[in-house]
Amino acid sequence: MTKVILNRRAFVAATAATVATPYFYTRASAQDRVLQVGVYNSAQGGLIKKEVLPAFEKEFGCKVLTTEGATLANLASLRATRDNPIYSVMSMDDVGVPQAKAEGLIDPLPMDEIPNLKNVFPRYLFEDNHGVGFSVSIAGLFINPQMTQPIQSYEEIFDPKYARKMLLNTPKNTQSVLMLIVASALATGKSLQEAQYMTDEGWTKLADLKPNVLTIYDGEAQVMMVAQGQASIGGIEYSKAIYPHTRKGIPLDMSFPKEGAFTGINGLALVKGAPQRELGLAWIDRLLSPEVQKMLAEATLSAPTVNGVEFSDDSLKYLAYPQEQMEELNLFTPDWNYIIPRRAAWLEKYNTTFS
């Protein structure tokens, strides 16, 4: 769904505005300068529309139209408009960037035209700079800390004491791929990095988890089953689905076993043939600015991707930030170029395993 953030008074004011900006500025009416972008259909997307968009419109003398969606829907929007692009910037997770690049839907980001790119941690630039992360969640297990001790190793979740005590994320979600990598690491004794290429050896181990699975869940609301004591462990899940509950005092917390934690990266890409390229680059730069990065991180409890942002200790305990914390968590990002062509077959086998 496309939403136009517009009212008559704002339109008249913006049309008349010719605001000087540090870069990317050309004289034109706001009516002529319409930037269309894709944002996530989430609390984060709503926050960007409320806190970032109005100031951006005012500064650049333009209107910003937003389309809300998740990665797959946003990729579909780019395919549908390939011959006549309407978007200049599209939100997509790191998992979507290789596919978008392969299909020729996006262009590389010009490093010299987006000043804040220089502050981005290299691990959050994807596919020869065809995408950049701007918000990072951590994926691991979640528990009720009043009932379950932190999980030291993923091997523990296979213990018979957890029979019918685990919530397993649906095979439809990316998190299921992460659980397969975990099973492969346990089966082979290899690191997560190595085990992602050895998944044929992980299926038997994954099947061993079946007696412990209470249910397969496909909605964030179901994580409350752990808080209510109906289950002991859940996962693999992103921290952005858990930590907001933790902050409210609900008995839910993340647990990151010694094998490592996974990244969940929200990103941005410059659309090929972007009709408002300069405004699009300015939009990306704005979302990577220290001020916006700090605001988004504190509101959504997902880490920034740029260096040098300062947080209170209360905020930092929820974030994979700064660099030292990333290393302590043994933070790992899968090789999506390897995984994506195999994912359909894995999904089918996953469904068979847990049917």
Task: Specify the residue positions occupied by each region the protein language model found.
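N-terminal secretory signal peptides and thylakoid transit peptides that target proteins
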Residues: 1-19
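A ligand-binding cleft/hinge motif common to bilobed small-molecule-binding domains
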Residues: 96-99, 232-251
